[in-house]
């Protein structure tokens, strides 16, 4: 199983590099159809376990960087600056996405323990974990953890729900726990929409209208970040 791959010993970068090299041999042998499909499944589980490990490492890296910045006398308002960009660079991603990677990692490790556990075991994908984080981002920490626990308590756990279903269920529970936060999010998202006009194709001799967001929905942008530190409201 994924969790026993390195026999609980400390895994080094050299170990990971060697394992990556081993993966290059997959698909070159004479495996039968059953073995091939099993390998595909195991690799999917490995991707999820790797995403969970990245989350844990990201949070630890961020903590060490903030500590070093404080020790260096960096002004309080600047603490943490540049951390997300370094994470994005390590992931070969745009620096602009660094804050999202960092936010998701902090949410999973601090506020969504059941979701993180499912990811570690390869039961859900990183995208499904992101959906849960996104749909609960407007809640208090207490309510966010409650949604996480309730999703995990479903028959079959979080893994039994597809992407759409898990997002809808998380949204439903969130609304039950704090309808004000959910309606505020919807209202804010609606206010950030705008109507645009663009020239239609020549054969239509007119203009075409459409609805577009001025910018990504704020709550969706924040969807991977830790919940706001505010007292939980009564439902």
Question: What are these language model-derived features?
Answer:
Residues 1-235:
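Conserved C-terminal region and hinge/linker of Rieske [2Fe-2S] proteins, especially
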């Amino acid at each position: 199983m994924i969790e026993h791959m390195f026999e609980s010993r400390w895994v080094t970068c050299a170990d990971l590099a060697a394992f990556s090299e081993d993966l290059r041999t997959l698909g070159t042998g004479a495996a039968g159809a059953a073995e091939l499909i099993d390998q595909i499944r195991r690799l999917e589980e490995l991707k999820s376990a790797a995403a969970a490990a990245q989350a844990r490492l990201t949070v630890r890296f961020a903590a060490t960087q903030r500590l070093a910045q404080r020790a260096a006398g960096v002004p309080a308002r600047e603490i943490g600056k540049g951390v997300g960009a370094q994470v994005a660079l390590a992931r070969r991603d745009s620096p602009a996405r660094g804050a999202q990677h960092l936010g998701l990692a902090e949410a999973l490790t601090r506020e969504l323990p059941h979701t993180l556990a499912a990811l570690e075991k390869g039961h859900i994908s990183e995208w499904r974990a992101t959906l849960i984080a996104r749909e609960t981002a407007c809640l208090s920490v207490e309510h966010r953890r409650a949604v996480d626990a309730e999703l995990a308590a479903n028959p079959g756990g979080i893994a039994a729900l597809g992407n759409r279903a898990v997002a809808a269920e998380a949204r439903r529970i969130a609304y039950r726990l704090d309808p004000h936060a959910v309606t505020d999010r919807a209202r804010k998202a609606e206010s950030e929409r705008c109507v645009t006009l663009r020239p239609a194709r020549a054969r239509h001799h007119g203009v075409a209208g459409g609805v577009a967001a001025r910018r990504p929905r704020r709550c969706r942008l924040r969807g991977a970040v830790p919940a706001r530190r505010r007292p939980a409201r009564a439902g």
